Amino acid sequence: MIQTLTIDQLGHRGDGVSLSQGGATYVPFALPGETVEAEPVQGHPDRRKLLRVEVPSPDRVAPFCPHFGVCGGCAIQHLRDEPYRTWKRNLVIETLAQAGIDVPVDPLIDAHGAGRRRITLHARRGTHDILKVGFSATASHDIIGIDHCPILDPGLNGALEAAWALAEALTPVGKPLDIQVTATENGLDIDVRGSGPLPPKMITSLSQLAEKHKLARLTRHSELVLLRRPPVVAIGKAKVTLPPGAFLQATALGEQTLAELAMAKLGRAKQVADLFCGVGPFALRLAEKARVFACDSDAPAVTALQKAAPATSGLKPVKAEARDLFRRPLAPPELRDFDAVLFDPPRQGAQAQAAQLAASRVPLVIAVSCNATTFARDAKLLIDGGYKLERVIPVDQFKYTPHVELVAVFRK
């Protein structure tokens, strides 16, 4: 049954929200102030599929990507920039308010820069043996085949062509391939997962494809297939050779912005701990000013940091350790010598480590987060432990999505 709905607000996932039916009804791709026609979505009683915009919002703009609305990569290309920025900042404000945290939230910083420098493509042969390579569809496990994505860093030029070639060679049926592609200074770094055991002849074929597409490196489940040139990224003064499948911030400008915000708040700190350090996007920059202790559960990432730090001139000592901070967080006695601690955990946050920090006497804590909800939970622990949350700075590197980064400053 087709319904006519008035959209009252924009939800936290970028959906239009209608409150006219006695409860919240979510309509993807609709905007506040619009009157729309929509139909029910089977199995989702509170969701509707947008059929037509009868009365458009003055804030509506034409999406710039032909795949928008079908591809699940972007949620909100159809909103003017100013209200988009307001909505995204409000995601942080509202999440903190729901947790009972009242703190100044700065204006949103745009850190999209040149675009995304790492992507994960999916590939699978489906009906009639047709191969699809692309991103997941909106709210679905279907694959949307694409040959171009306008939000990618130019360093990923050739990524889609290489992914198609690899998928054609591996002919995935049933379970899809995951093809992670990262832009590096020496070319594309690709790690393929989901292929299962391969005969030597296929490994040779993949090596030839890597040569043809001039990949820096090709790995399969992190095992080397071909190394043409080291996949290197610049982090501050350092050059880091990435381990296969390494985590990086989504954009180069995003990483730089987060690091510069953190460094600006560290003042004259001489001993700094960088927790959940990864390959060192903070540690290698912090070491320009202070001695750094860094740790993370990702042993290959820590090894990459350990190699890069002593090879970079002008840095103070960096000690790095592989350690699972979810199971073995640094305890107050281990934290007592630090002037400042920075932590940048995955989306699940750092509850165990935040509890230990709350019991410590570290005078300055900088939190970096990609999930406002888990940040709010961890921030409450620090506040209850005597820290004052001074400010929160939202950073937008996942542009056109509901995801937002933030940097927060705590003092005791």
Curated annotation (Swiss-Prot):
Please verify whether the record's keywords include Iron. Answer: yes
Residues the entry annotates as binding S-adenosyl-L-methionine: Q249, F276, D296, D344
What keyword terms does UniProt attach to this protein? 4Fe-4S, Iron, Iron-sulfur, Metal-binding, Methyltransferase, S-adenosyl-L-methionine, Transferase
Q: Give an example GO biological process.
A: rRNA base methylation
Tell whether Protein transport is among the UniProt keywords: no
Positions of transmembrane segments: none
What EC class is this? transferase
Gene3D superfamilies with a match to the protein in the record: 2.40.50.1070, Nucleic acid-binding proteins (2.40.50.140), Vaccinia Virus protein VP39 (3.40.50.150)
The EC number(s) attached to this protein equal: 2.1.1.-
The protein in question is named Uncharacterized RNA methyltransferase RPA0948
Q: Which organism is it from?
A: Rhodopseudomonas palustris (strain ATCC BAA-98 / CGA009)
